[in-house]
């Protein structure tokens, strides 16, 4: 059952990044949107930490996915407001580093960048999802080294891409 919910989370995370990029242009107030993301990030942080609580002691488990989406939203704002490639690259790199304290560290900002790059092209969108799935599998494979046998690790990495892969198909 836990694997089922993990796969739902895998499906949801990449889907949220995709819809964040796709819906950005339709947002009437970028400031209000950012404030809503921040509000939901703050509201959901305690339940997020409680979900990972062990031995009845609440601890900080990093920032939840809503904070990650806020960082990704910042990437969209910078890419919209500046054409300076150095500034865009610097902010994207800063965002990826900042995401290390969040759920879906590194991956969500990279997914967002892929979807920005692919905007308007069905071929590029498909390629972006394929790259995202391969990146996710590589991260899971690397994370299992030393924790699982090679066979178990490969099976886990392949199983973990079901959710992200379905997101690209749907």
Predicted regions and their residues:
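Alpha-helical transmembrane segments and their immediate juxtamembrane cytosolic regions
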Residues: 1-170
């Amino acid at each position: 059952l836990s694997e089922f919910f993990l796969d739902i989370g895998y499906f949801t995370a990449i889907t949220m990044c995709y819809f964040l990029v796709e819906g950005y242009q339709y947002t009437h107030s970028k400031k209000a949107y950012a404030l809503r993301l921040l509000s939901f990030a703050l509201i959901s942080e305690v339940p997020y930490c409680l979900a990972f609580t062990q031995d009845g002691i609440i601890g900080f488990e990093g920032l939840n996915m809503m904070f990650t989406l806020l960082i990704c939203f910042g990437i969209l704002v910078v890419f919209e407001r500046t054409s300076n490639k150095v500034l865009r690259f610097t902010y994207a790199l800063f965002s990826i580093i900042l995401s290390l304290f969040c759920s879906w560290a590194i991956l969500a900002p990279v997914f967002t960048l892929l979807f920005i790059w692919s905007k308007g092209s069905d071929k590029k969108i498909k390629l972006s999802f394929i790259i995202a799935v391969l990146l996710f599998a590589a991260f899971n494979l690397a994370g299992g080294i030393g924790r699982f046998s090679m066979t178990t690790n490969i099976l886990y990495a392949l199983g973990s891409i079901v959710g992200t892969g379905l997101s690209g198909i749907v």
